Amino acid sequence: MIGTPYTEGARRAMLLGCGELGKEVAIELQRLGVEVIGVDRYANAPAMQVAHRSHVINMLDANALRAVIELEKPHLVIPEIEAIATQTLVDMEAEGVNIIPTARATKLTMDREGIRRLAAETLGLPTSPYFFCDTETEFNQAISEIGVPCVVKPVMSSSGKGQSVIRDIALSHKAWQYAQEGGRAGGGRVIVEGFIPFDYEITLLTISAVNGIHFCAPIGHRQEDGDYRESWQPQAMSDEVLAKSQAIASKVVEALGGYGLFGVELFVKGHEVYFSEVSPRPHDTGLVTLISQDLSEFALHVRAIQGLPIPNIHQHGPSASAVILAEGTSSNIRYQGIAAALEAVNTQLRLFAKPDIDGRRRLGVALARDIDIDSAVSKALDSASKVKVIF
């Protein structure tokens, strides 16, 4: 049963993290009559602008996190970012609070070590070779064993922060320092991974719902500086590779438990598929589903977490997204060229309405459909290029 917002019978959902992905989740929740409470570390975050009300707290402060959950008494607590006091969520789940998809899934996936050990050591899934390192001495030893090229990432980071590829061992110290600066909790543990010369990488959006496991068509994407720049759907792949990808994703999602949409990242090399990472929530590369599917990844997530069925997922055809990226410093961001960006048929824009910028920041995304993937990507890039960010 779903009541009406602001009434005694309302179903309340709390978003922990109010960025652009959380904003779309908030909109989908409201479409089903759910009262939405946004929580983040800064005011006027995108999802806060569409939530019924919001709170600003330090998300890593266990006491502050507990206090806001106890104050609002939400029926659903939906983590939308990794930088949260996850042990508090584990404790509160044991007290009866409904954490989406589960507190264990949130805690395991908040750092790369938990999910990599689950995938490789518990589930026996194929991954790149890896070492976890606490000191630069361990780091150098790991590089010597894995060899170059290799990939270095903080165990806790997002959007490519602190991530680099070492192609020359002489640059290892620089990579160590960069990883220490890029972690969400400051300096600390890193993962060194063998570099897989993959043919392509995909995100397989996998939904655990009341009526079973469902998959969206695979999403291909291009990364730059550890962050996505374009994504497209469907990614062309053989039936054999798709079946292997779905089998890996199913194992990971079932091991994590709970209902919801999971973004499973995979590398494909020839006929082999390697597990990379997973997010127990909508994925940034999945923004393409806002134009490519009848039910976006956000709509699917909101259905699943409320125990609602997913009878089918319709994919409209070759589609793409291209990021609108800006760099600068401002608290008065404006946009020009919107009309030009929307001139072509089957194009859409999402401007995230982020309140400020200090450095490089993703401020929106252009979406497009066309007769084939190359045309869709080209159209999305052209649309994105016409949006001018004014400071």
From Swiss-Prot:
The keyword Ligase applies. Gene3D superfamilies: 3.40.50.20, ATP-grasp fold, A domain, ATP-grasp fold, B domain. N(1)-(5-phospho-beta-D-ribosyl)glycinamide binds at E20, L21, E80, D284, K354, R361, R362. GO terms for cellular component: cytosol. InterPro entries: ATP-grasp, ATP-grasp_carboxylate-amine, ATP_grasp_subdomain_1, PreATP-grasp_dom_sf, PurT, PurT/PurK_preATP-grasp, PurT_C, Rudment_hybrid_motif. One of its GO terms (molecular function) is phosphoribosylglycinamide formyltransferase activity. Its EC number is 6.3.1.21. One of its GO terms (biological process) is 'de novo' IMP biosynthetic process. Mg(2+) binds at E265, E277. Residues 117-306 form the ATP-grasp domain. Keywords: ATP-binding, Ligase, Magnesium, Metal-binding, Nucleotide-binding, Purine biosynthesis. SUPFAM superfamilies: Glutathione synthetase ATP-binding domain-like (SSF56059), PreATP-grasp domain (SSF52440), Rudiment single hybrid motif (SSF51246). Pathway: Purine metabolism; IMP biosynthesis via de novo pathway; N(2)-formyl-N(1)-(5-phospho-D-ribosyl)glycinamide from N(1)-(5-phospho-D-ribosyl)glycinamide (formate route): step 1/1. It catalyses: N(1)-(5-phospho-beta-D-ribosyl)glycinamide + formate + ATP = N(2)-formyl-N(1)-(5-phospho-beta-D-ribosyl)glycinamide + ADP + phosphate + H(+). ATP binds at R112, K153, S158, S159, G160, K161, G162, Q163, E193, G194, F195, I196, E201. Homodimer. Belongs to the PurK/PurT family. Involved in the de novo purine biosynthesis. Catalyzes the transfer of formate to 5-phospho-ribosyl-glycinamide (GAR), producing 5-phospho-ribosyl-N-formylglycinamide (FGAR). Formate is provided by PurU via hydrolysis of 10-formyl-tetrahydrofolate. This is Formate-dependent phosphoribosylglycinamide formyltransferase. It comes from Shewanella baltica (strain OS185). The gene is purT.
